């Protein structure tokens, strides 16, 4: 189980050892991220040669982490201490611009006895 900004975050419907006592709603966080022109140039060169475009891989990893962080902060605002069923969605907004969106169900959980 991962903790982000003090919020438990899981992709499953439940958290082992905890029970859901209240559902607070949908927690969400998103970011639109563009690459730096220098990264774009390197990406074009790698694309010609073939293989992984590390510049974009790094950009998307950073965007996922930030979307997850923003989702956790939204869950806190809702009064939750956990988010279950976490999912990610991505879309291209433009050339070298991507949106990453994290969402899940904000809940209050208590440790089982």
Curated annotation (Swiss-Prot):
Pfam family, one: YbjQ_1
InterPro entries assigned: UPF0145_dom_sf (IPR035439), UPF0145_YbjQ-like (IPR002765)
Stored NCBIfam families: PRK03732.1
Family recorded in the similarity comment: Belongs to the UPF0145 family.
HAMAP family named among the record's database cross-references: UPF0145 (MF_00338)
Name of protein: UPF0145 protein TK1926
Organism: Thermococcus kodakarensis (strain ATCC BAA-918 / JCM 12380 / KOD1) (Pyrococcus kodakaraensis (strain KOD1))
């Amino acid at each position: 189980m991962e903790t982000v900004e003090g919020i438990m975050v899981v992709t499953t419907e439940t958290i082992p050892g905890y029970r859901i006592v209240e559902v607070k709603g949908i927690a969400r966080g998103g970011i639109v991220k563009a690459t730096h022109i220098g990264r774009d140039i390197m990406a074009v060169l790698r694309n010609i040669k073939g293989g992984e475009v590390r510049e974009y891989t790094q950009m998307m990893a950073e965007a996922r982490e930030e979307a997850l962080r923003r989702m956790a902060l939204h869950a806190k605002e809702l009064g939750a201490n956990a988010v279950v069923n976490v999912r990610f969605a991505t879309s291209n907004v433009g050339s070298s611009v991507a949106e990453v969106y994290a969402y899940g169900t904000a809940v209050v959980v208590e440790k089982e006895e």
